[in-house]
Structure formats: structure tokens, C-alpha cells
């Protein structure tokens, strides 16, 4: 974190809650959204906040996507409350479990992003619906990102916070050193950064 901070880069940790968390079930023998699971989760989060100061990580991504739980609103309220009690701002995937007002949405579905109207979207948001490097051929990414309209708006605003380019290492490679080029990271990053820095249609 200190290394990134010295170079003007903010780290936004993501702790997936409760989606993509099979490791939690295997380790503790219960689901994260169960009563016992939430008690364990609270201890883990408090340790995280104790170890990493607010000034180093003012945001915490709480995940929330691709999962169904018995009480989605209650679970989200539980997570958001702990995050806010430690003076952090929660971020959650959209679509995902229903967030509270004030939680930043990270949009990952093109069908939502393409229809996005920042006047009617109920919260601040981050554009990632065009930013999945593993979602198309690396040869196509450069033109896709360069022609993309960031946040579906001509300029930034209080709601449109920018974009995050996502590198999920889903492309199988025989050598870990090939992950970046096989996912189109170098050329994709250049086009994505240019569009989000300049903005406009």
C-alpha cells in the first residue's frame, strides 16, 4: 500500500461478501451470511481495519455479486454498517445484493451501463461494464475501450467517479508471465486510460 501511495495510486481492497467465498465455508464450516458466519466476518473485518489505517484505504469493496442469500438486505446492512463505523466508504458490485444509500456502485453489466443515466442512477458509480479484459479477444479490446463512452456521460460529475479496468485471470496460460499479454492488458490499459482521462463521446 505504501509503495502504491508513493506513486499516486490508491489501493481499494475487495473482500467478497458473501459471493465468491467458498473458501469461507470450507474454513469455518458455515456460510458467510449465517449468524455464525457474520460473527466471524465481523472479527475478520475489525482486524483488517486495525491493520490498515483509514488514510491508506478510505474505501472497501464488499463484493455482493453473483450470490443468493436468505436475507440480502439484512446482510448488506450488516456489512455496510461495519465499514462505515470504521470511517470507510463501501463499494459494491451492481448488479449484486441491494446496497444502502451512500454505497458506491461498481457497474459490471453492459445492459445496465449502456442504459445508464447518471441523473436517475441512485448512487455514485464506477464504470467497469466495458472494462473486463478477459471478456473478449485481446485484439479487439483496444478499439472497444477507445470507442467507449466513459460512465455513459461526456464529463465526470459528483456521481460518475470514473472506471476500473478488471483483469480476471480466466485465460489459461502455460506460463504465468503470459497472463498480461494473453489478457490484452498492455494495449487495453493504454486505450482505457486515454478514454477515461479525456472523457467525451
Placement of each model-derived feature along the sequence:
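Small-side-chain structural scaffolding
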Residues: 2-4, 17, 21, 90-92, ...
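A generic structural signal for short, solvent-exposed coil/turn residues
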Residues: 3, 54, 84, 97, ...
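Flexible, acidic glycine-rich loops studded with aromatic residues
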Residues: 100-103, 109-201
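Structural preference for beta-strand elements that scaffold enzyme active sites
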Residues: 8-12, 57-61, 89-91, 102-106, ...
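Active-site-proximal loop/turn and secondary-structure-junction residues that shape catalytic pockets
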Residues: 15-21, 66-68, 96-98, 109-111, ...
Amino acid at each position: 500500500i505504501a509503495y502504491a501511495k508513493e506513486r499516486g495510486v490508491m489501493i481499494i481492497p475487495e473482500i467478497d461478501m458473501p459471493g465468491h467465498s467458498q473458501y469461507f465455508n470450507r474454513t469455518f464450516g458455515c456460510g458467510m451470511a449465517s449468524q455464525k458466519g457474520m460473527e466471524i466476518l465481523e472479527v475478520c473485518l475489525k482486524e483488517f481495519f486495525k491493520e490498515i489505517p483509514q488514510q491508506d484505504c478510505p474505501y472497501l469493496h464488499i463484493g455482493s455479486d453473483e450470490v443468493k442469500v436468505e436475507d440480502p438486505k439484512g446482510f448488506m446492512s450488516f456489512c455496510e454498517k461495519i465499514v462505515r463505523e470504521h470511517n470507510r466508504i463501501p463499494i459494491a458490485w451492481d448488479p449484486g445484493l441491494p446496497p444502502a444509500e451512500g454505497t458506491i456502485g461498481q457497474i459490471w453489466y453492459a445492459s445496465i451501463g449502456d442504459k445508464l443515466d447518471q441523473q436517475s442512477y441512485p448512487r455514485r458509480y464506477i464504470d467497469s461494464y466495458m472494462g473486463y479484459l478477459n471478456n473478449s479477444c485481446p485484439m479487439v479490446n483496444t478499439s472497444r475501450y477507445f470507442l467507449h463512452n466513459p460512465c455513459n456521460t461526456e464529463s465526470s460529475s459528483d456521481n460518475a467517479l470514473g472506471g476500473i479496468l478488471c483483469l480476471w485471470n480466466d485465460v489459461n496460460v502455460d506460463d504465468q508471465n503470459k497472463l498480461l499479454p494473453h489478457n490484452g492488458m498492455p494495449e487495453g490499459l493504454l486505450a482505457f486510460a486515454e478514454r477515461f482521462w479525456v472523457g467525451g463521446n
